[in-house]
């Protein structure tokens, strides 16, 4: 009879999964029925594995608290979204889409405005503080914000995500210098970073567990989850205090008269770039039927 052990997937690469059990790390493959059933293991999954002749096999994936397509992780307790106001400048819509996906799954978000030694990103930080997010301004070069970020991560299973070249790996190195992760350069011609992180892998940093994930660009947004239009309003925390105050119960917060959200927008209580992102995501959601997401 095979011995079954339980552990967490800490690395996924080319169909192989490194699973950390109580006292060791075992490289495993997944049973074919998982792949055929459309539920492939993700970094962060709690799994049961069997080991025979030194080879591991993922037998079962425990129920997930949450899961993401991009970054490809499960069971997050905090998602840290990296952004910068210098080359490569982060598009607000990219931040907002990832924020909304996390909000839809009730995963807390921290916005890390990085490279503040080059540009403090004050306006960018203000947008997300106004929206109700935790915002930390950091610099791997000067150490700005590193201790504050360390405290925010403490005791949590987290993922670092953001566009390529925004400095996720540099901040991980600043948090834990012994990691010595490779750091890429930003292409001056293309204005975007080169990928240095090519797979998702977990790292122990103090008492936090951090997933470093590959960077993405605006071309990757179509691979991300789509939120049902009925749920989208709840994924924007700054809308919360106005929900239920609109003239119409089924208000979409777009063109309807008596909308409390658009009234707040006109009064400057909701940021315009955030609201514009809501409209773009709503348009995408209108093209999706609920049955397509199951």
Feature-to-residue mapping (PLM):
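Canonical P-loop GTPase G-domain recognition
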Residues: 115-166
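Helix-rich effector regions associated with P-loop NTPase G domains
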Residues: 2-3, 15, 38-55, 61-79, ...
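A conserved segment at the C-terminal end of the G1
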Residues: 168-184
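Conserved hydrophobic positions within beta-strands
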Residues: 7-9, 58
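SH3/SH3-like beta-barrel fold
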Residues: 17-21, 28, 49
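Beta-strand/loop nucleic-acid-binding surfaces
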Residues: 25-41
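Phosphate-binding glycine-rich loops and their immediate beta-loop-alpha structural context
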Residues: 86-132
């Amino acid at each position: 009879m095979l011995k079954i052990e339980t552990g967490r997937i800490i690395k996924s690469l080319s169909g192989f999964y490194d699973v950390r059990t109580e006292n060791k790390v075992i490289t495993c493959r997944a049973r074919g029925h998982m792949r055929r059933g459309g539920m492939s293991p993700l970094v962060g999954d709690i799994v049961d594995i069997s080991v025979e002749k030194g080879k591991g096999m993922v037998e079962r994936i425990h129920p997930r608290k949450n899961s993401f397509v991009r970054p490809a992780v499960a069971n997050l307790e905090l998602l840290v979204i990296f952004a910068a106001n210098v080359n490569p400048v982060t598009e607000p819509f990219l931040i907002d889409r990832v924020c909304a996906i996390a909000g839809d799954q009730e995963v807390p978000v921290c916005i890390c405005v990085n490279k503040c030694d080059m540009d403090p990103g004050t306006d960018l930080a203000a947008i997300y503080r106004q929206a109700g997010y935790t915002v930390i301004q950091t610099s791997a070069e000067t150490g700005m914000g590193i201790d504050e970020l360390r405290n925010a991560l403490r005791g949590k299973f987290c993922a670092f995500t953001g566009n390529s070249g925004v400095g996720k790996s540099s901040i991980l190195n600043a948090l834990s210098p012994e990691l010595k992760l490779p750091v890429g350069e930003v292409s001056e011609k293309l204005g975007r970073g080169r990928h240095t992180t090519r797979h998702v892998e977990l790292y122990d940093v103090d008492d936090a567990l951090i997933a470093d994930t590959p960077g993405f660009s605006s071309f990757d947004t179509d691979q991300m989850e789509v939120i049902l239009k009925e749920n989208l309003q709840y994924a924007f925390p700054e809308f919360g205090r106005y929900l239920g105050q609109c003239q119409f119960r089924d208000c979409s917060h777009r063109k309807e008269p008596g909308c409390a959200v658009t009234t707040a927008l006109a009064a400057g209580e909701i940021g315009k770039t955030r609201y514009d992102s809501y409209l773009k995501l709503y348009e995408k959601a209108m093209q999706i039927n609920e049955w397509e997401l199951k």
